[in-house]
């Protein structure tokens, strides 16, 4: 047994092997130690025959190399979203178009005036690059960016209501994804929650009766990821603004999803609509219905925005150059009515007729391919969702295809597709692919994935 154990190569010898030199020692060392330990166990337990051991020794380098490649593969990989959920939170929310990326890439590849005033030759603020366009679009006095809307909520509460009361309706104490709850955020911001009204009904008098010397703010939160129906009432933001002004308090509307108003989305409030009432502060997301990068956008009165800029938290919550450039390009597309540059808007605006045609073309490609005999394919009507915690009561008539593999169970089929980056849905014994959320080039990749799965 000892001579067999001595036949195992030394760790240092393997680390120095030409086939493994491309990998870091920190990656290789645990893989080598683990593999050698397994071989030692097999030798000591007489699990391997001499011939099997010889084969295992010859395979050490290829096995270690394969494991090292797997260990160093990026975990963030591209996938195809065939779920029909446009702003898919788990798949990165809104997608940026090639046109937007082409516009901002030259800036990312060079130095630029992120915080530099060319005219004065002095340092400037990074927030100036989007302030003008936001003020022009919404008629507000000033604007500020942070890294997401949750950061906007935290910054606003901490700046204006630390150790003071924030009045809010019980029906608006929402929780969004990742267990982000308004009451918990208030606690983190050192604000005191003053909840008024009932879960289903809150009247203006409920807010007014709660105002006292400790009150700093009346906050309204948009119920963006759920819908109350029936015996319900919530106060309009116009009423909240007037009440806050009457009592010299700050009114703040956390709009969340950030619908600009470019699409008719039933009764979903838009930023433009709310800005007509001149709120003190309003915040919303950049990567939901706006269709841009992940940012939190704060707009409102210049005096209040100036105070936000002096909060030390802003340094920890500030946006980077990519987000600023991407938002600026997205907003310019809105200004110029170039909605085709914003994939989120384009996908939500597809008509059922366009989607049916797209689904029929995909079916035709599959039936004309070498895997046609392995599948049953049908064009079917579907219902897409906006996603991103937005307009939960709305679905969009869509089309897609159903796939049923003749020699695979549906769960195994779905797993195989997912492993290669095709994210789909299961209905009964069939895989559903909603074509609404397919991007340019996705159909070609779908054909490759289906071919790989069904020909193996």
Curated annotation (Swiss-Prot):
PTM sites of type N6-(pyridoxal phosphate)lysine: 288
A Pfam family assignment: SelA
Gene3D superfamilies in the cross-refs: 3.90.1150.180, Type I PLP-dependent aspartate aminotransferase-like (Major domain)
Keyword field contains Transferase: yes
Cofactor: pyridoxal 5'-phosphate
Catalysed reaction, written as an equation: L-seryl-tRNA(Sec) + selenophosphate + H(+) = L-selenocysteinyl-tRNA(Sec) + phosphate
GO CC aspect terms: cytoplasm
Main subcellular localisation: cytoplasm
First-level EC class: transferase
Keyword NADP assigned: no
Keywords tagged on the record: Cytoplasm, Protein biosynthesis, Pyridoxal phosphate, Selenium, Transferase
EC number: 2.9.1.1
Domain of life: Bacteria
Subcellular location per the Swiss-Prot or TrEMBL entry: Cytoplasm
GO MF annotation list: L-seryl-tRNA(Sec) selenium transferase activity
Pathway: Aminoacyl-tRNA biosynthesis; selenocysteinyl-tRNA(Sec) biosynthesis; selenocysteinyl-tRNA(Sec) from L-seryl-tRNA(Sec) (bacterial route): step 1/1
One GO term of the biological process aspect: selenocysteine incorporation
PANTHER family, alphabetized: L-SERYL-TRNA(SEC) SELENIUM TRANSFERASE
Family stated for the protein in its record: Belongs to the SelA family.
Chain's role: Converts seryl-tRNA(Sec) to selenocysteinyl-tRNA(Sec) required for selenoprotein biosynthesis.
Protein name: L-seryl-tRNA(Sec) selenium transferase
Organism this protein belongs to: Helicobacter hepaticus (strain ATCC 51449 / 3B1)
Gene that this polypeptide is encoded by: selA
């Amino acid at each position: 047994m000892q001579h067999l154990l001595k036949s195992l190569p030394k760790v240092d010898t393997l680390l120095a092997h030409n086939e493994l030199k491309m990998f870091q020692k920190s990656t290789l060392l645990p893989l080598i130690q683990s593999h050698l330990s397994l071989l030692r166990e097999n030798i000591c337990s007489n699990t391997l025959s001499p011939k099997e051991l010889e084969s295992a020794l010859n395979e050490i380098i290829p096995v270690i190399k394969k494991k090292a490649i797997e260990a160093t593969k990026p975990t963030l990989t591209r996938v195809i979203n065939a779920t029909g959920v446009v702003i898919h939170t788990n798949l990165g929310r809104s997608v940026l178009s090639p046109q937007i990326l082409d516009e901002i890439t030259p800036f990312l590849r060079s130095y630029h005036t992120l915080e530099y005033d060319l005219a004065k030759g002095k340092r400037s603020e990074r927030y100036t690059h989007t302030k003008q366009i936001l003020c022009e679009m919404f008629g507000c006095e000033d604007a500020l960016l942070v890294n997401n809307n949750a950061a906007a909520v935290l910054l606003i509460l901490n700046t204006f209501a630390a150790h003071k009361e924030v009045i809010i309706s019980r029906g608006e104490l929402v929780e969004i994804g990742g267990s982000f709850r308004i009451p918990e955020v208030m606690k983190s911001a050192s604000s005191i929650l003053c909840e008024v009204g009932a879960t289903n009904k809150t009247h203006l008098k409920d807010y007014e009766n709660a105002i006292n010397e400790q009150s700093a703010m009346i906050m309204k939160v948009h119920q963006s990821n759920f819908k109350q129906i029936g015996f319900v009432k919530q106060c309009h933001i116009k009423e909240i603004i007037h009440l806050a002004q009457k009592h010299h308090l700050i009114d703040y509307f956390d709009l969340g999803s950030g619908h600009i108003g470019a699409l008719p989305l039933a009764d979903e409030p838009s930023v433009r609509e709310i800005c007509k009432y001149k709120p003190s502060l309003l915040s919303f997301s950049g990567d939901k219905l706006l269709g841009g990068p992940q940012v939190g956008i704060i707009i409102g009165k210049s005096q209040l925005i100036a105070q936000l800029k002096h909060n030390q938290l802003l340094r920890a919550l500030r946006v980077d150059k990519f987000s600023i450039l991407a938002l600026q390009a997205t907003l310019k597309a809105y200004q110029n009515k170039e909605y085709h540059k914003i994939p989120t808007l384009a996908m939500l605006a597809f008509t059922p007729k366009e989607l049916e045609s797209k689904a029929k073309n995909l079916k035709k490609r599959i039936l004309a391919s070498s895997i046609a005999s392995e599948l049953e394919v049908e064009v079917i009507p579907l219902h897409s969702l906006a996603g991103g915690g937005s307009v939960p009561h709305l679905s969009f008539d869509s089309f897609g295809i159903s796939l049923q593999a003749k020699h695979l169970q549906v769960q195994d089929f779905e797993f195989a597709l997912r492993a290669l980056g095709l994210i789909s849905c299961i209905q009964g014994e069939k895989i559903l692919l909603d074509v609404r959320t397919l991007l340019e080039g996705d159909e070609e990749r779908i054909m490759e994935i289906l071919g790989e799965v069904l020909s193996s």
